[in-house]
Amino acid sequence: MTIKTLALQCRDAAQVVSQLSSQAKCALLQAMAAALEADAGTILAANARDLEAARAKGTASAMLDRLALDDKRLAGIAAALREVALLPDPVGRITREDVRPNGIRVQKVRVPLGVIAMIYEARPNVTADAAALCIKAGNGVILRGGSEAIHSNTAIARALQRALREANVPEAALTLVEDLRRETMLELLQLNDIVDLAIPRGGEGLIRFVAEHARVPVIKHYKGVCHLFVDASAEMELALRLLIDGKATRPSACNSLETLLVHADIAERFLPLAAQALRERKVELRGDAATRAVLPEIAPASDDDYAAEFLDLILAMRVVADLDTALAHIRQYGSDHTEVIATQDPDNAERFVQSLRSAVVMVNASSRFSDGGELGLGAEIGISTTRLHSYGPMGLEALTVERFVVRGEGQVRH
């Protein structure tokens, strides 16, 4: 079956999903969660095959962490589906209502986007998360995962499709692309008359390929080169907490810290504390000349290090003269994802917030809060770094659009 045929079937199924009541969608997602639990053995066995193949290829530890499933992670995925089921339904929500002087009633109403193509790598949880969010928002979804997770993705998709069938919803509403050739993905990205939005999540190469070749509208979920700037006024213990949580708790996450910027006035006090805490957690440190003057044992940092999304226990460090220098560094090397300042100076905090265009800006809070669930969205399909209708963590509402509904009693304009 061609990718165009699959997309057409998904579009037809999306029309069915768009007409489901909130109650029906809630029940469907609950059933999808139960299907994952029922198929746990099959899914974990499939994941073991993917992990074995990935290790044989020498896959990096960060990628292996993203790929791996276990009982706890699978239970978390099922729980996340149940949480999505209970979220408020954005479809049909009236966001504006007005009666014009001529008597027509004008409403802006949220409706599903239609068909969403999700293109991603090495994250089998995305198969379930994206399916749940897209269906809850009344859409169909085409899932194109990476070859490294093909067995996991297939097992998860089969379980979810069974729940769709049992609810009398066309299983094409959740379409998994099993032909992973690049030319097939390229054909999918050309189907702008069928697919309404493409969302790539993965490495820089994948996202650039999608952005450069798509005729379908694209919202990029670009790499997370996230910074922590420790201002001269920062409380040391607070800054250390932000640093350790941001770098060492889950370095493979896109909201983990990759670069530490430290104000020169406190570098001699803060850097030794930071280095000790990070070494205890096996973090490799790389720094500029000013950082190495305080920490001579660490490796030098290159321009490539400052632009890198390590997704590993590696941290680039730099001493900066002031807030302006920190901002200039972030503008040069950042990816518009998430930036953090540790400061007790309210003026500097406000200038940091106002001077950066990043999707998420934190003041005295960990970069790890850059997550849809943590920010009150309930769940997210990703973190948009594209300044379009959705910027930052994308929840259910971002998978809908507003349209006008006008009701009258025969009014004409002329």
UniProtKB/Swiss-Prot annotation:
GO terms for biological process: L-proline biosynthetic process. Pathway: Amino-acid biosynthesis; L-proline biosynthesis; L-glutamate 5-semialdehyde from L-glutamate: step 2/2. Its EC number is 1.2.1.41. InterPro entries: Ald_DH/histidinol_DH (IPR016161), Ald_DH_C (IPR016163), Ald_DH_N (IPR016162), Aldehyde_DH_dom (IPR015590), G-glutamylP_reductase_CS (IPR020593), Glu-5-SA_DH (IPR012134), GPR_dom (IPR000965). One of its GO terms (cellular component) is cytoplasm. PROSITE patterns: PROA. Keywords: Amino-acid biosynthesis, Cytoplasm, NADP, Oxidoreductase, Proline biosynthesis. GO terms for molecular function: glutamate-5-semialdehyde dehydrogenase activity; NADP binding. Catalyzes the NADPH-dependent reduction of L-glutamate 5-phosphate into L-glutamate 5-semialdehyde and phosphate. The product spontaneously undergoes cyclization to form 1-pyrroline-5-carboxylate. Belongs to the gamma-glutamyl phosphate reductase family. This is Gamma-glutamyl phosphate reductase. It comes from Xanthomonas oryzae pv. oryzae (strain KACC10331 / KXO85).
